[in-house]
């Protein structure tokens, strides 16, 4: 039903529980018989609680849910869009398409789910200790279980054979930790959907060749995408057929470890492996840094370190991104006809609206964070205190003797 606030109309969908079959059949009609689309939507994007109760029967309900919430935020600002206007942009995925996390999380009070799609994490300071490595692992899992994709860089891990101050004496290098993070990703699943992970390393790292080869063994590092960060100096050395120096730490003026390699041979290996197994991806890192807005504020601590799992968005540690797509097909007028053309005017208008909606989604994300913090403040957990007794049998034994 509809209601009006300040001349803006809003649609409210009454909460009703649907069976899986009801939701599937209605979604099948919505997608005009596309069984895969209907099944994926019901399994992944329909609002449901932890008991499996389904509260939406088709993407139309989902689009009203998103439109209502975005319209609520819009009402805080001038020239607010109504829920009906927003629904017209979302319906049937015609123009503006919020991606997975916003589709699932906006207006969803049954699940703790972030509205951000992807995160990059990292550790400041001494980052190659086991404590730091486990901290990244824990943060990765906590984000993934709340529907976030994660990326992080491994260039801080000391190379294989480096001395360590424990019983092992030397480091195993970064490849075993690729397996650790990969396995953690595979362990986190939601309705058959596992986490998404990007692992990156600088070509300057002495273990970068082992990193590049890690996925050539079948069954290894299957829970992660891997990309190597290529520098201009490496690419120039590969073109010129000159040697390239790798070192650890990678940016140190006085590195602890250095080795010289053939840049051309390593470049050929990257190309071969990418041809054979579709990995590693390549990140032209100096170009990324030159174009990076955060790195303009490097003196304030901002630094781009890795990308989201799909590799299209470089991010700083503990930064996040929200994804939204625009369906270009819908802007083609008279498709597949001689007089077909692209409606640039409508496209320009919708690009501006899409960015505005993304700003609204940030407001919605902040609300979720505020609710989480309010719960923590109002419901603090009691701290456990443990008092142990040693020699517990001694008093009894001594009394018996006496």
Describe the function of each predicted region.
Residues 1-389, 393, 397, 402:
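Extended catalytic cores of very large enzyme megasubunits
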